[in-house]
Structure formats: structure tokens, C-alpha cells
């Protein structure tokens, strides 16, 4: 918060925001501002994220929606007194919000204490159900695929997705002893191989029903043979993965997926590829943390930190939208915030006042390389989508 005091004394920073120094907020003003949110819960912020999600759907018009659900640990281990900073599974004290992504966009989040595990209560089912209902009521009835890791493997979740929501899912499975024993008894001839660029897997698929389940589900066992750089892995360090999915099992949902142009998702190889893309999806966590600059939240009160976290998430969604709507010809869509700042924010400029106007002056090289005129034009005319309220 002290950085606000430094910026308040920076006339150039104030001018860049089209403010005068006396209009800039101090650290005490920001603390008073966030204190207003102590009694404000998650719901109002989640409503804003949902509206932005619907806006992006109408802008990008996807025929198939792939959601990714996971928790993100915010390491606040240095905090001496901070509400809801509790031990996490990463053996660090902090917060552990539940997050749902569509591509790079954070479309829903539930701010939670650090000790609250992935599949706590019915949080995940309610969050997914809320998004699915919004998609169907305010966008269109398109196939939805949900990607999760083994922390969300639960028969209750699966039945909710299959029977209530009517969506497809790909979920990492837990490595139970009887399952591993079954796989070890299989012959090499029963395995098939799949490679994606330099990465290679051996896999086998079968129907599996755990003791507490009342139905069989499609299960795929894969073992990673080579790393992304093509390096072969020794037998004792190979990564084994179980995957559960209803793609190809639920005939009605699979047919809708094929009609929407997703016939390739029915293949075992594509399911393995999607499941292992969860690791890439987790790079969204890195992007959010890098966007913020650090993982520590600044306040002692949970309500103030909650508001701070949601403002960060909303800003990150708008940042991702800006890269695609305004800066797509200038900077890669998948660049991290540090690269974005270095190329599109941290460049030399001069602010001069002439008459009653402030003028931002840059060199000719920056003007042409960053296409300042085009950025200015697109920033002033953002894409508009007709959204049903």
C-alpha cells in the first residue's frame, strides 16, 4: 500500500492517468476504500466475473466450451496475523481460492482459506453448475467439456455432471493400489502409443468401477515415456496417470460434440492430450501471480483481502481481453504480464502541456513499431456484444 504514497508524489505518473497529483489516492485512502468491503462476500464479485465471461463468449463465439477447474495457493507464509491464512497442501500458509477458467480467462472464483481443500463440500459443483446454466441461458446450448485434476475425482461430482448438468468431463484419477496392480498385469501388446511432437505416452483404456460406484466409467491409463524435449524417462521415474471421462460413453452428449465439430475429442489420444493440457492451464495461475507482482495479499482482514483478490482477477480478465481485442497484432496472445509491461507499458515517452491539452510524445520508432495510432483507435472503440440480460 505504501507505493500509493510514492505515486501520489509522481507528477508524471499522475499525468499518464490524466490526473493531477492531488487527485491521486494515498495509502490511507486505499485502506479506507478496501475497509468498505469487509462485510461484502464473494457473490457480488463473482457476478462481475460472470458478466465479463458472457461478454467474451458473445465476442469470440465458441462452438465448444472447455472449462478448467483448480485451486490456486497464494503463499502468505510470512504473515504474522492475517485472517484465513492457514496451512495449505503445499506446506505453506496462505489462501487457496477455487478458480474456473475458460482459456486464459478467469470466469469464476471462490475466495477461501488455505486449509480448504479442492473438493470441499459442494463448492465445486455449485460453481460449475452456475457457469453451465449461464452459458445455456445467456449464450447458447453448446457442448461443454470440464477439465479437472484428481483432487476433484468424486462419484458425486461425476453423477452431477452426467445427470444434472449434462456436460462432458475429463478428470484425473487417483492411483489406487488395485488399479495399479491391474495395469501391471497387462501385457505390452495391450498398450498403444501416442506422441505429440517430442512427448510420447503409452496408454491403455478399459472400463472401471470403484467399490463405491454403481456404474462403470471409461478409464484411460497413460504413462509418460519422453519429456517435452524428447528426453526418454527411466522406468522408475515415469509419470503414470489415470483419466476418467464420459466422452464416448454418453451417446447423446458425444453426438452433440461431434455435430459441433469436436469429433477429434472422442479419440483416446485427444483425451490424453487434453488431460495433460491441465498443466498448461495451470500457467494461468502463474500469469495471475505475475500480473499482481507477488502472492502476498496486503491486509489483515479477510474481507479486505477478498476484495483485493477479486479486483486482481477482474483486472487480469480485462488484460487478457485487451491483448486479443487491441494488441493482437503487436504482442503474442500468450505472453506473460512481464513481457506485456516491458513492450507496451515501459517505453520512453514525454508528457507535455499545450493550451488546455496534455500530449504524450514518443519517438517515431516506438510510434510505428507499437502501432500507437491503431492501439489508440481500438482502445477507444472496444468490441460490443449484444447480450441478453
What residues fall within each predicted segment?
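Short, conserved catalytic/metal-binding motifs centered on acidic residues
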Residues: 1-4, 21-22, 26, 30, ...
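Short, positively charged, Gly/Tyr-enriched micro-motifs
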Residues: 1-48, 102-106, 136, 144-146, ...
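Active-site-proximal, Lys/Arg-enriched surface segment
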Residues: 21-23, 27-99
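Electropositive, glycine- and tryptophan-enriched low-complexity nucleic-acid-binding patches
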Residues: 87-139
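Domain-level cores of phosphate- or acyl-group-handling catalytic modules
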Residues: 119-178
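An anionic, glycine-rich sequence signature occurring as long contiguous blocks
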Residues: 168-283, 287-290, 381-389
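Short, solvent-exposed helix-loop connector elements
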Residues: 255-260, 264-275, 290-307, 323-335, ...
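A short, flexible helix-boundary coil/loop motif
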Residues: 318-389
Amino acid at each position: 500500500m505504501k507505493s500509493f504514497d510514492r505515486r501520489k508524489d509522481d507528477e508524471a505518473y499522475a499525468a499518464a492517468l490524466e490526473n493531477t497529483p492531488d487527485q491521486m489516492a494515498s495509502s490511507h485512502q486505499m485502506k479506507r476504500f478496501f475497509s468498505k468491503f469487509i462485510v461484502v462476500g464473494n457473490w457480488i464479485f463473482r457476478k462481475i466475473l460472470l458478466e465479463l465471461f458472457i461478454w467474451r463468449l458473445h465476442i469470440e463465439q465458441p462452438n465448444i466450451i472447455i472449462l478448467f477447474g483448480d485451486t490456486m495457493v497464494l503463499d502468505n507464509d510470512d504473515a504474522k496475523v492475517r485472517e484465513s491464512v492457514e496451512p495449505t497442501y503445499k506446506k505453506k500458509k496462505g489462501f487457496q481460492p477455487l478458480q474456473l477458467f475458460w482459456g486464459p480467462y478467469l470466469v469464476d472464483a471462490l475466495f477461501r482459506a488455505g486449509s480448504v481443500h479442492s473438493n470441499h463440500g459442494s463448492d465445486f459443483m455449485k460453481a460449475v453448475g452456475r457457469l453451465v446454466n449461464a452459458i445455456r441461458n445467456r449464450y447458447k446450448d453448446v457442448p461443454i467439456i470440464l477439465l479437472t485434476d484428481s483432487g476433484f475425482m468424486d462419484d458425486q461430482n461425476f453423477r452431477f455432471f452426467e445427470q444434472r448438468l449434462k456436460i462432458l468431463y475429463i478428470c484425473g484419477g487417483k492411483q489406487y493400489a488395485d488399479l495399479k496392480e491391474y495395469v501391471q498385469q497387462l501385457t505390452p501388446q495391450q498398450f498403444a502409443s501416442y506422441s505429440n511432437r517430442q512427448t510420447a505416452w503409452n496408454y491403455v483404456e478399459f472400463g472401471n468401477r470403484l467399490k463405491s460406484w454403481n456404474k462403470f466409467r471409461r478409464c484411460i491409463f497413460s504413462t509418460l515415456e519422453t519429456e517435452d524435449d524428447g528426453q526418454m524417462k527411466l522406468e522408475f521415474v515415469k509419470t503414470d496417470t489415470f483419466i476418467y471421462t464420459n466422452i464416448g460413453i454418453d451417446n447423446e452428449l458425444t453426438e452433440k460434440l461431434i455435430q459441433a465439430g469436436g469429433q477429434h475429442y472422442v479419440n483416446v489420444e485427444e483425451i490424453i492430450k487434453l488431460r495433460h493440457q491441465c498443466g498448461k492451464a495451470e500457467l494461468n495461475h502463474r500469469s495471475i501471480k505475475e500480473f499482481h507482482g507477488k502472492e502476498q495479499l496486503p491486509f489483515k482482514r479477510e474481507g479486505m483481502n477478498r476484495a483485493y483478490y477479486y479486483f486482481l482477477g477482474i483486472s487480469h480478465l480485462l488484460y487478457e481481453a485487451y491483448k486479443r481485442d487491441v494488441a493482437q497484432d503487436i504482442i503474442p496472445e500468450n505472453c506473460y504480464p512481464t513481457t506485456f509491461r516491458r513492450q507496451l507499458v515501459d517505453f520512453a515517452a514525454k508528457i507535455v502541456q499545450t493550451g488546455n491539452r496534455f500530449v504524450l510524445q514518443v519517438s517515431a520508432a516506438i510510434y510505428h513499431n507499437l502501432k500507437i495510432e491503431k492501439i489508440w483507435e481500438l482502445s477507444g472503440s472496444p468490441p460490443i456484444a449484444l447480450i441478453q440480460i
